[in-house]
Amino acid sequence: MGLAWGLGVLLLLHACGSNRIPESGGDNSVFDIFELTGAARKRSGRRLVKGPDPSSPAFRIEDANLIPPVPDKKFQDLVDAVRAEKGFLLLASLRQMKKTRGTLLAVERKDHSGQVFSVISNGKAGTLDLSLTVQGKQHVVSVEEALLATGQWKSITLFVQEDRAQLYIDCEKMENAELDVPIQSIFTRDLASIARLRIAKGGVNDNFQGVLQNVRFVFGTTPEDILRNKGCSSSTSVFVTLDNNVVNGSSPAIRTDYIGHKTKDLQAICGISCDELSSMVLELRGLRTIVTTLQDSIRKVTEENKELANELRRPPLCYHNGVQYRTGDEWTVDSCTECRCQNSVTICKKVSCPIMPCSNATVPDGECCPRCWPSDSADDGWSPWSEWTSCSVTCGNGIQQRGRSCDSLNNRCEGSSVQTRTCHIQECDKRFKQDGGWSHWSPWSSCSVTCGDGVITRIRLCNSPSPQMNGKPCEGKARETKACQKDSCPINGGWGPWSPWDICSVTCGGGVQKRSRLCNNPKPQFGGKDCVGDVTENQICNKQDCPIDGCLSNPCFAGVQCTSYPDGSWKCGACPPGYSGDGVECKDVDECKEVPDACFNHNGEHRCENTDPGYNCLPCPPRFTGSQPFGRGVEHATANKQVCKPRNPCTDGTHDCNKNAKCNYLGHYSDPMYRCECKPGYAGNGIICGEDTDLDGWPNEDLLCVANATYHCRKDNCPNLPNSGQEDYDKDGIGDACDDDDDNDKIPDDRDNCPFHYNPAQYDYDRDDVGDRCDNCPYNHNPDQADTDNNGEGDACAADIDGDSILNERDNCQYVYNVDQKDTDMDGVGDQCDNCPLEHNPDQLDSDSDRIGDTCDNNQDIDEDGHQNNLDNCPYVPNANQADHDKDGKGDACDHDDDNDGIPDDRDNCRLVPNPDQKDSDGDGRGDACKDDFDQDKVPDIDDICPENVDISETDFRRFQMIPLDPKGTSQNDPNWVVRHQGKELVQTVNCDPGLAVGYDEFNAVDFSGTFFINTERDDDYAGFVFGYQSSSRFYVVMWKQVTQSYWDTNPTRAQGYSGLSVKVVNSTTGPGEHLRNALWHTGNTSGQVRTLWHDPRHIGWKDFTAYRWHLSHRPKTGFIRVVMYEGKKIMADSGPIYDKTYAGGRLGLFVFSQEMVFFSDLKYECRDS
């Protein structure tokens, strides 16, 4: 039995030893990360705690930044092991805080530029993420349903072999994951020199939160052995090979050469050869000797254990100062220390003494505590007297007492222990409660005056009886008063004020003047005395001698005041207004010259006429309104300057627009000066407006407009579906947009391969769903029907796509007309279509869709107008439209002479058209050279949407750039845009990923309007438009959601879209992709992606089959933004003024996100730079 037991123990030890994971030591098969980073260090960012494995330390991560990295030499060994076995096994036990995201291991660059490789437990998404940096770009591979952040202990086994990864959580096998590159290409030979291995440390918010134990890299074993050692059953740990073969003789981290049982090969069934069996017999003979020796050793240990047990059975003893005591014995060491034996332990303690009540206590010899002794004094033994008690009564006579105590054991204590004395605090009050009562009234007093009106008074007292002991006071008045009257008092008279002196009787030589007064202040009454003194008073006046009058000869200028003096001299006053001089002689003042802006200056002419005297202004020029001042003198001319303002019929009420139309002022140089435009919900020519249900600019019924003015007065051929182009191929009065069979070939449009060509046979040779009758390449598959040169021959079959007479195979710009074939940078792409014409870039890559190739795109744009500094014709002045009418390389925004005719812009009457003679035949301030067409683009100003930009004259989205905002997404298609109405109407037909259709016209200040219509009941997502577009990462967007909804994919961020209209500014650090996609869906701010400027607080979503009309105003110079959305005739939503200066202008376009059948109709944009 003993032999069998010993052999079993040895075999068990042998088996466990062969399967045990070796500790890190001299070999490189196991790398314990905590051991390598110095687990025993203090203040190392971790704290030792208990884990599920009692034989290994576990650490709570407190500050991962303080945990040192793995030493470079050990990290190099680890890298060499990974490269040798083309993979690794990573083991770890962890207890991660709930719903947190934390990094288990990370290989970070020493220059802090980022991570090369990391293993992250993403508790928010329930995944284990492997992050790899490949060619400077981060790739993330996730193992789904890896629920590790639960607050419970979890054990993971991660096996990575080349480009495959397999995860086990506890004993449960997760799904395989595939890496973008083999792991050995990440763990390069020089990795340890440029990077370091960190535990628990990730990005800014990705440090691990929780407890870690046994974090190890293991090599030279298999996942089966690892799982078996963990106690996992074979059924749960069956390993499926990852289809990796041994390369160049290296062994993989997990052996993949397992072969299943065979039933006919005996040796294969046994698994051991005969030679191996012979070897095992020899080993077992040697083991027999070892087992015998082991039996002897165990027998000896058993005997020693018995002797030790006998010793333990003896009763316990105590030893103190060499003396032996049994349990329970007590003894005294000295007079103050007592000891006792208790379970082999000696316990000693000091004797505690009581407090003595006497003052003469002493300690007798041989004792530890003091004692009191008898005394001969009678007072000895008494304590001091206590304080007297309170008096026994509060009034009258009472008593007080005090006491003392006696130590009768040690003293005689003669005398009393209590003393008593009398006390008297105050006399007791013998009164009783009594209410007060009035006495009788006193007689009335005599009158207070001897004459006139006075008063008499009487009084009474509250003393019959007086109130006491809180009795009630008397009620009523203690004093009464009433009037008394005597004879009236006499009033003495008083003088009133003197009157003014009257006129002197003569003007010179001495005369008399007098004044008077009345006795009425007051008049004497009731026997009063009259006033004392005279009623009148006289005095002498004008005593001076009479002079000689020098002004009698009229020496001054007509109208000038003359002043004479007694000596016969005289003096003239100032000249009249409009004259200058000394008063004797006065000359006319030229007010037009003295005040050069007294009248309106027009075309360099001061419209002022001088008269004698005075001046007058000429009437305001044609198309101006204002006053016509006239008068005399410089002061009058300065204070009353003529102001002539351009006439505006829209504000002065002289227009003839319909009451349901808006008057748009075009400027006083235009003829006419205004244009009438029907308001949303109405259509017509502006003079006459009728109802327009679908808001496409065409009335529901025919309107009786003036002769030859039928534009937008004709009845809408699809009154309930926007179709601003009114296309009607078969001329049946039903527009193509709502006609089920446009070509009347009895084939419905949704199944007709030529909906606008009669072809009942539906022949389609090239199977591109475009019938041969309408296919511009009937023998070449081209469903897009692209035709760059518009010659009727599709690009797919054209030998010269762009029509420049150069065959495609020799054309360096196949889609752009360029006869010269100039190619400055010799990259095979002609300058006309090269997005970096001066730098070699044959791939033409443009990651941010700003039409500048990545090779030359530096994104440095100091004025934020969408044009980088080295390509901006005004790098320091925002001018998104880059207008340069004289083509001198300097944009109009920073050019003081836009037409280069030598006349500065501020004085040029044709700023954009050269006219050095400045001829202006009608004198209206607009030169003849640009009369009625300011930019000379052959479009009259009244019809020109941008009269000051020769490059833009009408709204046109026929050419647009399609921008995918989630180019890697495969859950939906890219948008499909259908162009109608010469680019003024676009329809997006499919449920798609987020995308834009951006026109090529660029704008500074702009107004943008259009009709929005969803022609389906399917889906409820986003549609809208963009403005200020500069790249796929930088633009403004107005987007509208029908219902509140969370985006289905919560990676990389959770996105909640609320119903209602939103205005957002996109400034993405990542550009198109899943980050921007989720940020656009989310109603709110997403750091580094999107900021919401405004969201409709009423959360009104769009309705199916309902027409809406939007109007956008954007003024980049001030940052002003306003969006108004109409439903029919009424405003449904209004953002009000929003101010944001992120972008100084850009391009316009349309936006969709997961919404099909979106109609954008009757699109209009207008420049607002003036």
Swiss-Prot record:
Tissue expr: Odontoblasts.
Record domain TSP type-1: where: 379-429, 435-490, 492-547
Gene3D superfamilies, per database record: 2.60.120.200, 6.20.200.20, Laminin (2.10.25.10), Thrombospondin type-1 (TSP1) repeat (2.20.100.10), TSP type-3 repeat (4.10.1080.10)
S-S pairs: 171-232, 391-423, 395-428, 406-413, 447-484, 451-489, 462-474, 504-541, 508-546, 519-531, 551-562, 556-572, 575-586, 592-608, 599-617, 620-644, 650-663, 657-676, 678-689, 705-713, 718-738, 754-774, 777-797, 813-833, 836-856, 874-894, 910-930, 946-1167
GO cellular component entries: cell surface; collagen-containing extracellular matrix; endoplasmic reticulum; extracellular matrix; extracellular region; sarcoplasmic reticulum
VWFC domain boundaries: 316-373
Alphabetized UniProt keyword annotations: Calcium, Cell adhesion, Disulfide bond, EGF-like domain, Endoplasmic reticulum, Extracellular matrix, Glycoprotein, Heparin-binding, Repeat, Sarcoplasmic reticulum, Secreted, Signal, Unfolded protein response
Residue ranges constituting the EGF-like domain according to the UniProt record: 547-587, 646-690
Region (Disordered), start-end ranges: 839-944
Annotated glycan sites: 248, 360, 553, 708, 1067, 1085
One BP term from GO: response to unfolded protein
Ranges annotated as biased composition (Basic and acidic residues): 840-854, 883-894, 917-941
Motif (Cell attachment site): 926-928
Domain Laminin G-like, residue spans: 65-270
Family assignment from sequence similarity: Belongs to the thrombospondin family.
Description of how the protein assembles with itself and partners: Homotrimer; disulfide-linked. Can bind to fibrinogen, fibronectin, laminin, type V collagen and integrins alpha-V/beta-1, alpha-V/beta-3 and alpha-IIb/beta-3. Binds heparin. Interacts (via the C-terminal domain) with CD47. Interacts (via the TSP type I repeats) with CD36; the interaction conveys an antiangiogenic effect. Interacts (via the TSP type I repeats) with HRG; the interaction blocks the antiangiogenic effect of THBS1 with CD36. Interacts with ATF6 (via lumenal domain).
Protein name: Thrombospondin-1
Organism of origin: Bos taurus (Bovine)
